[in-house]
UniProtKB/Swiss-Prot annotation:
Residues 217-299 form the KH type-2 domain. Keywords: Cell membrane, Cytoplasm, GTP-binding, Membrane, Nucleotide-binding, Ribosome biogenesis, RNA-binding, rRNA-binding. It comes from Nocardioides sp. (strain ATCC BAA-499 / JS614). The gene is era. This is GTPase Era. GO terms for cellular component: cytosol; plasma membrane.
């Protein structure tokens, strides 16, 4: 007698998918939606993402590693040049490149620039994702999908898939995960169960502090903010049942006037940044946090190679 439905199990798949797109195209929000947890900071400020962060999606049949990259753009500073170089290096090492094109905006020169760059990477599978569909009408989404197909034809880019998705509402997020897994090579699990990111906790904490600092900032100031965690560890002498994580971090800006904006009247804004960041860090790490923040000036750090090295770029 044979067991019905007991045929060979599908092979396990694993691999890397990189989300690319112009600044503020929804890459980070989509990464968090697929992982199911906040592993990448988000903001409506362009060029929020400055590091390559890997978010890990665990499934019975696959492990999908999502590589969130800074937005590709025409750089105006040394920092911008280094971020672009970081993206291009990353794209050479992944299995699938997924280009994010917001459905609530027309395909523009920035999108064309990026897809042209992608066309130069010959052997990597390419997917187009129409992001932010919750902000567009059905007619607009249909028009956008046709524009994406046309852009592929014009640039010589062969799309393996074109997928409309809303990370905010969750619409088609699971479908996108299924499609991406299907494009991965067969392979073993690459990260332990339970790992949601490969970033060190110090980097995740610094990014959450920067996200809190960016809220409400205008003009060029968001680009001038950098955060470095100088010291982080469990406080000694605490009972095991009541741990406390001490984090000492510096928020860097480029000018004295910017320092005053970050601190705010009588330190009110800095306290607010600390309160919001502490809540996010505690939610991510599952440990009560004591957060000590200081604001320092690193003059013109975006253009200074020595300062960039000091700040981790």
């Amino acid at each position: 007698m044979t067991n019905q439905g007991s045929g060979p199990q599908p092979a396990h798949r694993s691999g890397f998918v990189s989300f690319v797109g112009r600044p503020n195209a929804g890459k980070s929000t989509l990464t968090n939606a697929l992982v199911g947890s906040k592993v990448v900071i988000t903001s409506d400020k362009p060029q929020t993402t400055r590091t390559v962060v890997r978010g890990i999606v665990h499934r019975d049949d696959a492990q999908l590693i999502l590589v969130d990259t800074p937005g590709l753009h025409r750089p105006r500073t040394l920092l911008g040049e280094r971020l672009n170089d970081l993206v291009k290096t990353t794209l050479a090492e992944v299995d699938v490149v997924a280009v994010c094109l917001p459905a609530n905006e027309k395909v523009g020169p920035g999108d064309r620039f990026i897809v042209n760059e992608m066309a130069k990477i010959k052997r990597t599978t390419k997917v187009a994702i129409a992001t932010k569909t919750d902000l567009a009408s059905p007619d607009r989404i249909a028009e956008h999908l046709l524009d994406i197909a046309r852009l592929g034809t014009e640039t010589g880019t062969e799309w393996a898939e074109i997928v409309p998705v809303s990370a905010k509402s969750g619409d088609q997020v699971e479908l996108l995960a299924d499609l991406l897994v299907g494009l991965l090579p067969e392979g073993p699990q690459l990260y332990p169960d339970g790992d949601l990111s490969d970033a060190p906790e110090e980097i995740l904490a610094a990014e959450l502090i920067r996200e809190a600092a960016l809220e409400g900032l205008r003009d060029e100031l968001p680009h001038s903010v950098a955060v470095v965690v100088e010291e982080m560890g469990l406080r000694e002498g605490r009972p095991d049942a009541k741990p406390l994580l001490d984090i000492h971090a510096n928020v860097y800006v480029e000018r004295d006037s910017q320092k005053g904006i970050i601190i705010g009247p009588k330190g009110a804004r800095l306290r607010d940044i600390g309160t919001r960041a502490r809540g996010q860090i505690e939610a991510l790490l599952g440990t009560p946090v004591y957060l000590d923040l200081h604001v320092k000036i690193a003059k013109d750090w975006q253009r200074d190679p020595r300062q960039l090295r000091k700040l981790g770029f």
